């Protein structure tokens, strides 16, 4: 029954057969999507990359082809030679782009058979994610998955064309490089030729693209794989793709302008959506104070309301102790929600899972306020609270009182949870904007040191540079924190519908400033030389002012397609545990290989 492909030459994709082909012979190849018997006639839905076309096999006119068709099963790989005709009236299928024509088979060739599939090639498949990834080659046969990857390919095409027209040069940077972990862990690759030494897979091409600027390639771009060995949160991958670019002799505005025009081009060409440029800019401080996060979803309300000043002298001990300890009090007014006690209890459990001690609340009713805490407030405090929150009957006010960082974490997450749970988000909207005016560093209580908000190569604002040296000389830790926290970075993040899709900065191009920043971050001279000596050396030889940005391509594609997970934009992704069910990676290796690498696995 099986035929070698031999001289068979496909003339058209199944999904491209049209009314223009009526009366013509076509040669098609693909998979049997579906087969139906209808009294001496067999109908085959033949599927390939471009779509499905109906093939008709008539026993009366072509018994040989009919005999072959009769033995076909789902997902057999076949070739069809036949003539295109118009479908009989009343049998058209407007859901298919080929739905007004069909191919009458003269000959059917079977190139390969298929066993019964672990799950059908249908859009609605009730199988686990693990099973889909194990049989990814079957999952990718589904229309939606195929379209996702074709869409991603178009993003690549448009991006490359855009940067080429803008005068950028595409340059590849190494995958085997030096370990310079900042934040996430590096994936390490042992060197056989240099026992005990390791390469690292890059978390980003950051240092190489800066060195390319020093080399004089003033406009570089790359679509590049990056790697992070981190605990995978909800929607992360250990290997991911960035659209990366860097420019010399530019300000923030010029780098941001390129980013805006790229995103606007992608939206216009792929979705037919006109994004208004320049995008709005909001400060880091405003984002945190209003939304509790530096990547807010602004497609719904529920902004955070500042209440610390109202309760600074309150008799309510919980609030009073927070204010005395330098904390803050904020609230969300969930307008018209009329939350039940059960719903409030569920929200309390949610915030407790984030580290909150509990959830204070007030239910505003027509003639009274229902709450376990309102009895502790003075009449003046209650009145000011109702005015500040613009409270009306039916509203429920939800409070958080703690250290500033914890309040932002609790209410920022609670706001998003309410938005999703109660369907407050306008899904038809595209809200894209910049977050700017980031602090350069913040104090990490656990590590007891300053950490970069972006990375250690971000340039501070020019007027803030003297403060870095001042902070370095300051011995009092609290004063040092105050000085450092007042330093603003020349950094910018692009946010789309509550997701950070890109981030960048103007970089440090002066060795003296870079050394001061390293010292403030607790990276001493010896460590700086060990990790970043090649960069410090390069900065001595005429480094131009430069800056750039990187977009998370997987995330951009997922958001544009309205997908819940970036996994659906990647051909062969890993699970949340960093496993590839298709290949079984990561896996044990032959002891001989380990011996060659001078590695011993300890139990």
Curated annotation (Swiss-Prot):
PROSITE patterns: AA_TRNA_LIGASE_II (PS50862). The record marks 38, 90 as: Important for tRNA non-discrimination. One of its GO terms (cellular component) is cytoplasm. ATP binds at residues 228-230, 237, 500, 552-555. Keywords: Aminoacyl-tRNA synthetase, ATP-binding, Cytoplasm, Ligase, Nucleotide-binding, Protein biosynthesis. Aspartyl-tRNA synthetase with relaxed tRNA specificity since it is able to aspartylate not only its cognate tRNA(Asp) but also tRNA(Asn). Reaction proceeds in two steps: L-aspartate is first activated by ATP to form Asp-AMP and then transferred to the acceptor end of tRNA(Asp/Asn). This is Aspartate--tRNA(Asp/Asn) ligase. It comes from Aquifex aeolicus (strain VF5). The gene is aspS.
């Amino acid at each position: 029954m099986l035929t070698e492909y031999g001289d068979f030459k496909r003339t058209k994709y199944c999904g491209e057969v049209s009314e223009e082909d009526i009366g013509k012979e076509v040669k098609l190849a693909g998979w049997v999507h579906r087969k139906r018997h209808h009294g001496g006639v067999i109908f085959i839905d033949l599927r390939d990359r471009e779509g499905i076309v109906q093939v008709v096999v008539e026993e009366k006119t072509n018994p040989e082809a009919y005999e072959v068709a009769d033995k076909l099963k789902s997902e057999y790989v076949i070739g069809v030679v036949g003539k295109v005709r118009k479908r009989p009236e009343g049998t058209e299928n407007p859901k298919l782009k080929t739905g007004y024509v069909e191919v009458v088979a003269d000959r059917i060739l079977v190139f390969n058979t298929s066993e019964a599939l672990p799950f059908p090639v249908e859009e609605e498949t009730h199988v686990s994610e693990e099973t889909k990834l194990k049989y990814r080659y079957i999952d990718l046969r589904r229309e939606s998955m195929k379209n996702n990857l074709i869409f991603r390919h178009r993003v690549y095409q448009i991006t490359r064309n855009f940067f080429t027209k803008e005068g950028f040069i595409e340059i590849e940077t190494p995958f085997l490089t030096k370990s310079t972990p900042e934040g996430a862990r590096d994936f390490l690759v042992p060197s056989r030729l240099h026992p005990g030494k390791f390469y690292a897979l890059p978390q980003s091409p950051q240092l190489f693209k800066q060195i390319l600027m020093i080399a004089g390639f003033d406009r570089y771009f790359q679509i590049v794989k990056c790697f992070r060995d981190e605990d995978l949160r909800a929607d992360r991958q250990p290997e991911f793709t960035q659209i990366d670019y860097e420019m010399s002799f530019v300000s923030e505005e010029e780098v941001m302008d390129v980013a805006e025009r790229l995103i606007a081009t992608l939206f216009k060409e792929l979705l037919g959506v006109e994004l208004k440029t320049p995008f709005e800019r909001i400060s880091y401080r405003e984002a945190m104070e209003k939304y509790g996060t530096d990547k807010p979803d602004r497609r719904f309300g529920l902004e955070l309301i500042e209440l610390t000043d109202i309760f600074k002298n309150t008799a309510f001990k919980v609030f009073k102790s927070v204010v005395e300890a330098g904390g803050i009090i904020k609230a969300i007014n969930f307008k018209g929600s009329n939350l039940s006690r059960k719903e409030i209890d569920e929200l309390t459990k949610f915030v407790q899972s984030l580290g909150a001690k509990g959830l204070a609340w007030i239910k505003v009713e027509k003639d009274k306020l229902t709450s376990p805490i309102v009895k502790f407030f003075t009449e003046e405090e209650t009145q000011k609270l109702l005015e500040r929150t613009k409270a009306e009957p039916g509203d429920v006010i939800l409070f958080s009182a703690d250290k500033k960082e914890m309040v932002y974490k609790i209410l920022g997450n609670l706001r998003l949870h309410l938005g999703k749970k109660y369907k407050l988000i306008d899904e038809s909207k595209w809200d894209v904007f910049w977050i700017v005016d980031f602090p350069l560093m913040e104090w990490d209580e656990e590590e007891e040191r300053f950490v970069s908000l972006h990375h250690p190569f971000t340039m501070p604002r020019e007027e803030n540079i003297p403060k870095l040296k001042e902070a370095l000389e300051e011995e009092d830790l609290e004063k040092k924190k105050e000085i450092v926290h007042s330093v603003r970075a020349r950094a910018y993040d692009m946010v789309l519908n509550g997701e950070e899709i890109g981030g960048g900065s103007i970089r440090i191009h002066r060795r003296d400033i870079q050394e001061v920043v390293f010292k403030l971050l607790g990276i001493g001279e010896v460590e700086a030389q060990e990790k970043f000596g090649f960069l410090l050396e390069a900065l001595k030889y005429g480094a131009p002012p430069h800056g750039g940005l990187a977009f998370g391509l997987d995330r951009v594609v997922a958001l544009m397609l309205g997908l819940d997970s970036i996994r659906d934009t990647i051909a062969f992704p890993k699970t949340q545990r960093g496993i590839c069910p298709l290949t079984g990676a990561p896996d044990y290796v032959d002891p001989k290989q380990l011996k060659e690498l001078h590695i011993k696995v300890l139990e």
